[in-house]
Amino acid sequence: MKNSLIKIRKSLVKSDAFDEYVKEARSFDIDRMHSLQQRMRIAMTLTVLFGLMTIALALAVAALTPLKTVEPFVIRVDNSTGIIETVSALKETPNNYDEAITRYFAGKYVRAREGFQLSEAEYNFRLISLLSSPEEQNRFAKWYSGNNPESPQNIYHNMTAKVTIKSISFLSKDLIQVRYYKTIRELNGKENISHWVSILNFSYINAHISTEDRLINPLGFQVSEYRSDPEVIK
């Protein structure tokens, strides 16, 4: 009987130990599962965070792309003078179109004023008058007069002077520089080339002129001061 009780007691002790073991094992599994779930939540949070950061970075780069563009340009070196200038394309903006129009009139003005061909002399005189302020008209008329020994009429006489524009650039909003070379051709075919720089003060005015004159100067381009000097050759 006593032995039976001892066996039962040992059996109960083993049962209690086993239950305790199972309880501890189950608790360990639960803790490990909780830890795994917590790590998964942290990983998912970090994944979402990095994803949002990537999207934000992509949007920032896309927004900055128009602000940083690479514009190719060409540099041209004048073989005669060694002067370097940048050759650029016309951009589709109002300011650049305004500049293009001004360059057109400035080039036209210099070609007419510095060039000479007897058959075009009368038209060019009229063109310069229409594109000049009253003060500059007077200065030009005195310079062009036959009484002036330096007048193109007296210098070139039976020769021709052709102006070729090399570059036109803005020094300020109302001051423009025109670089050109002049080819003087004599009757015997001999040519003499010289390089020049002209500076023009200009503006646009709303003058009352005839329809015929408006066809020559439709926008009221007007030169108020003009000078032309030989370009220094390096």
From Swiss-Prot:
One of its GO terms (biological process) is protein secretion by the type IV secretion system. Keywords: Cell inner membrane, Cell membrane, Membrane, Transmembrane, Transmembrane helix, Transport, Virulence. It is found in: Cell inner membrane. InterPro entries: NTF2-like_dom_sf, VirB8, VirB8/PtlE. One of its GO terms (cellular component) is plasma membrane. Residues 1-41 are cytoplasmic. Coiled coil: none annotated. The chain crosses the membrane at residues 42-62. It is a single-pass membrane protein. Residues 63-234 are periplasmic. Its main location: membrane. Pfam families: VirB8. The keyword Phosphoprotein does not apply. Component of the type IV secretion system VirB/VirD4 which could be a major virulence determinant for subversion of human endothelial cell (HEC) function. Belongs to the virB8 family. Interacts with virB9 and virB10. This is Type IV secretion system protein virB8. The gene is virB8.
